[in-house]
Amino acid sequence: MSLKKSPFFELRSGSVDTLLFTVKTTDLDALRAELVKRFEATPEFFADDVVAIDVRRLADGERVALADIRQMLNDVRMRPVGVVALATQGWAGEAGLPLLEARDRRAPAAKPADEAEPAAVPAVETAAAPAAAAAPEQSSDPAPTLVQAGGQTLVIDRPLRSGQQIYAKGDLVVLAPVSHGAEIIAEGNIHIYAPLRGRALAGVHGNHDARIFCTCLEPELISIAGIYRTTENPLPADVLGKSVQIRLEEEKLMIEPLRLT
């Protein structure tokens, strides 16, 4: 075969980042139900994102119907491109998807210089909400406001009205109120130095180390890495309307008062 370089195409070694969808159960009905619950409130977050199905967490001898999982992911608008499996999981190559190699990488937590210390009081612990958040109020705006920043901190210094949406690829700092029906989304941390009455979603591409900091917590929805809580599960009095930080601990949202003075 000729090794002459072609002016029309090039083949070379490379790597592409994808999300890993880690399968931890063989109960596909339970898996489907959990997918629906996670995505029904925020279906656009992973829309058209490529994903690799990771079956390495399954116990020895366990196997799943990868074709069914592939369809589940398509149903929530994700695009499966391959399977990550152990050498002993030979069945993983039978679904028509290529076998991929993966190096697990956990996104590092951002450490703001002026991050406030949490008060030494018990945290509020909550799991994912059992139902989707209520639909946002109607707005006279013709379309949501969408702002993107290429991995750097995005600062918003104007009030956000119902129907407006902000998306930051890094951290997001908001210096004005977030009204009911407004939505702020970040792949990193979110800092809100004003009342939060709409939705705040941090770490939306799976960053479990992301946090939300807020000086007045009155939200419709809060979420980190897909784990969310809505107003259907009322907040305790010691954090409602107060300054707080929100973080993940073992797949649960922890809401902790902040000591700012």
Curated annotation (Swiss-Prot):
Comp. bias regions, Low complexity: 118-144
Subunit structure: Interacts with MinD and FtsZ.
Organism of provenance: Burkholderia orbicola (strain MC0-3)
Pfam families per the UniProt record, alphabetical: MinC_C, MinC_N
Gene3D superfamilies associated with the record: 2.160.20.70, 3.30.70.260
Lineage start: Bacteria, Pseudomonadati, Pseudomonadota, Betaproteobacteria, Burkholderiales
Protein name per its UniProtKB record: Probable septum site-determining protein MinC
Sorted UniProt keywords: Cell cycle, Cell division, Septation
GO terms of biological process kind: cell morphogenesis; division septum assembly; regulation of cell division; regulation of cell septum assembly
Function: Cell division inhibitor that blocks the formation of polar Z ring septums. Rapidly oscillates between the poles of the cell to destabilize FtsZ filaments that have formed before they mature into polar Z rings. Prevents FtsZ polymerization.
Annotated segments matching region Disordered: 106-144
Family, similarity comment: Belongs to the MinC family.
